Swiss-Prot record:
Belongs to the pancreatic ribonuclease family. The lineage of its organism: Eukaryota, Metazoa, Chordata, Craniata, Vertebrata. Keywords: Glycoprotein, Secreted, Signal. It comes from Rattus norvegicus. Disulfide bonds: none annotated. One of its GO terms (biological process) is defense response to Gram-positive bacterium. This is Probable inactive ribonuclease-like protein 12. InterPro entries: RNaseA, RNaseA-like_dom_sf, RNaseA_domain. Coiled coil: none annotated.
Length: 145
């Protein structure tokens, strides 16, 4: 009986670990900030620290984009008629949004190792490019102004 309880607890812990990793790498976690967080100063620095956005080797990401649109609107990109080959990938298809989305582009200005990264904020609007699977957007591939 005790062995069964231990096995159950181990499985429960292991399942939660996997779920947390998936959430932390999802497109919504990495790129969607709706409604836009009310951070008056240093928006990019704050958001990148809060969401632990960095390269796998703990270096600072050179450029990062936050999209300020409803997740439902972002999910609809996958049904767009604007299907094309993704930039820099010859065999992967991207979908482009039908309308321009409000975004914030964070450009690295200082630091090289996370968390000592400093960013400049650039509000912009553009057509969003994503890759999709059967459940919706998977990866943000960029934007077109």
């Amino acid at each position: 009986m005790i062995l069964m309880v231990i096995v159950f607890l181990l499985l429960l812990f292991w399942e939660n670990e996997l779920t947390e990793d998936v959430v932390l790498t999802s497109m919504e976690h990495l790129h969607v900030d709706y409604p836009q967080s009310a951070v008056p100063l240093r928006y990019c620095n704050y958001m990148i620290l809060q969401r632990v956005i960095r390269e796998p080797d703990y270096t600072c990401r050179k450029v990062h984009v936050f999209i300020h649109e409803r997740p439902q609107k972002i999910n609809r990109i996958c049904t767009s008629s604007k299907k094309m080959t993704c930039p820099n990938y010859s065999e992967i298809f991207c979908f482009q949004s039908d309308t321009k989305f409000r975004m914030t582009v964070c450009q690295l200005t200082g630091g090289s190792k996370y968390p000592a990264c400093r960013y400049q904020i650039s509000p912009t609007e553009g057509f969003v490019l994503v890759t999709c699977d059967d459940l919706g957007p998977v990866n943000f591939q960029g934007y077109v102004e």
